[in-house]
A protein has these predicted regions:
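Bacterial N-terminal signal peptides that target proteins for export
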Residues: 2-12
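The canonical Cys-X-X-Cys-His
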Residues: 146-157
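Processing junctions and N-termini across compartments
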Residues: 17, 144-147
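Extracytoplasmic c-type cytochrome modules immediately beyond a signal peptide or single-pass transmembrane anchor
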Residues: 28-145, 159-173
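Bacterial signal peptide processing site
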Residues: 24-27, 151
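C-terminal motif of bacterial Sec signal peptides marking the signal peptidase cleavage site
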Residues: 19-22
Length: 173
């Protein structure tokens, strides 16, 4: 009589373990209040935007594209490996800010908020990849994507911020 080989025995044991695990039911969901307490979300939304997201976004926008004015034509893209590494690091801040906005205790309680948060991270990842490749056009497009996500989110959650410079542009007499 032949004995089953050890690999067949191991496969059978693995299948048995997987079956038992699958039949054990779902893990209990954690209470969202308990889940939120493990994250430090002490920065309020205004602080998170002003101290984290806006500076990183401004660096990306100031580092992509070109300016043509009375002084002439100027390209804004980084010109050194260190410059590209710097904007890549700022793009990583944007990725992680998107993640931070989705944390329990900070996120709004609807799907749109998560879509905007994920869109922010996606734009940041796109900018990171473009910076790593030193691809000026793709970096510019990543900045445009970032702008679109920010504008759409502000329209939904903070529309008055879209008009914050109106008085400076058209002063009231």
């Amino acid at each position: 009589m032949n004995k089953p080989n050890s690999s067949l025995r191991a496969a059978c044991l693995a299948l048995l373990a997987l079956t038992l695990f699958a039949c054990s039911g779902e893990a209990p969901e954690s209470d969202s209040a308990d889940e939120a307490s493990i994250y430090d979300t002490s920065l309020n939304m205004q602080e998170l935007m002003a101290l984290v997201l806006e500076p990183a976004s401004d660096i990306l926008w100031d580092s992509g594209g070109w300016v043509l004015d009375s002084a002439g034509y100027e390209e804004l893209y980084p010109t050194t490996d260190d410059g590209w590494a710097y904007v890549r690091a700022q793009a990583a801040v944007i990725v992680e800010t998107g993640n931070s906005l989705a944390l329990p205790g900070r996120r709004e309680d609807n799907d749109a908020w998560l879509i905007y948060s994920q869109g922010l991270s996606e734009a940041g990842r796109r900018a990171m990849a473009a910076a790593e490749a030193q691809d000026e056009e793709e970096f510019f497009q990543a900045g445009a994507q970032l702008y679109s996500v920010c504008t759409a989110c502000h329209q939904a959650y903070n529309p008055e911020i879209l008009y914050r410079f109106d008085d400076a542009i058209n002063p009231v007499d």
